[in-house]
Each structure stands twice: as C-alpha cells, then as structure tokens.
C-alpha cells in the first residue's frame, strides 16, 4: 500500500496529472474539463510509474538509456518489488534482501534477482497496470470530451503505458 501511495504522489500527480492540467488551463480549459482530465489521467499516471518500475528492471538499456537493473542495485522500493516480496519464498526473500541496494551486484546475481521478480511479481504487476489503464478509459468514456479529444487522450494513454523507454 505504501508503494502505491508513493506511485500516486510521484507519477500520477507530478509527472502526468499536474503538467497536463496546467497545460489545459493555459489553453483555456474549463473547470469541468480539467476535472475530467484529472479523472482520466490519474489512473494512467499510476500505470505510467508502474511501467517505469518494470523498465527499471527489465528494460532494454539501448532503448531506455539506463542500465537495466539499476533499480535493483539502488534498492528502489517499488510496487513491483513489494508484490515480488509478498509472493517470494524464504530463499528468494533472502536473495532479495541481500541483493537489493547492493551496487556491487554481479550480472549473475542481477539475473537471479530479475528471475525472482519475473516469477513472483511481474505478472500481477502487469495486471495492476492493465487495471489502471482500464480505469482511465472508463473515465474517458464517461467524460464530456469530444471524439477528437478522446482520440488524442487515447494516444496519450499509449505513450504513457505501452512504452519501452
């Protein structure tokens, strides 16, 4: 729950919702439109940060521009790792406890941690991302945005959620 609270403040608000709302206000959007925009973008902002956490462990460094596994070496406490910890057995938890936050992790140790995350947390993490994506689309469907605006916001969703960097 704490990890999701961090996601809410870090990404949903600061990285997605607030900048988009400010942009909409600057272009003269109504209060109703900015309220609708927040309802649509908040779950997509959550999904954006969760995708970022996945890319921090599994992303292609040639695409992301950062070393895959840095989040593990830095010991970032992400929702993906919280899910992994919940499902991990005692042996896997010991490996996670030893490896997370260890900047000296070898590539083999890093791969072992990735395998644990993939086995124990990644599937559920993807389900949560899909749930947030669907919540945003439900909000979009019930909004007063016109067809062109909905299409544009759907493209924004893809950029936020279906990204590889």
Question: Predicted regions span which residues?
Answer:
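All-alpha prenyltransferase/terpene-synthase fold signal
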Residues: 1-165
């Amino acid at each position: 729950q704490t990890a999701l609270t961090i996601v809410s403040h870090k990404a949903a608000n600061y990285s997605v919702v607030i900048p988009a709302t400010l942009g909409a206000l600057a272009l003269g959007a109504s209060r109703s439109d900015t309220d609708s925009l927040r309802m649509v973008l908040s779950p997509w902002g959550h999904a954006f940060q969760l995708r970022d956490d996945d890319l921090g462990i599994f992303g292609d460094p040639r695409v992301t521009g950062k070393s895959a596994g840095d989040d593990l070496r830095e010991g970032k406490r992400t929702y993906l790792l919280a899910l992994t910890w919940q499902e991990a057995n005692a042996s896997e938890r010991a490996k996670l406890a030893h490896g997370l936050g260890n900047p000296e992790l070898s590539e083999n140790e890093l791969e072992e941690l990735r395998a644990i995350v993939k086995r124990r947390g990644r599937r559920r993490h993807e389900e949560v991302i899909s749930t947030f994506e669907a919540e945003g689309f439900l909000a979009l469907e019930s909004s007063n945005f016109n067809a062109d605006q909905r299409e544009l916001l759907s493209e924004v969703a893809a950029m936020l959620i279906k990204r590889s960097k």
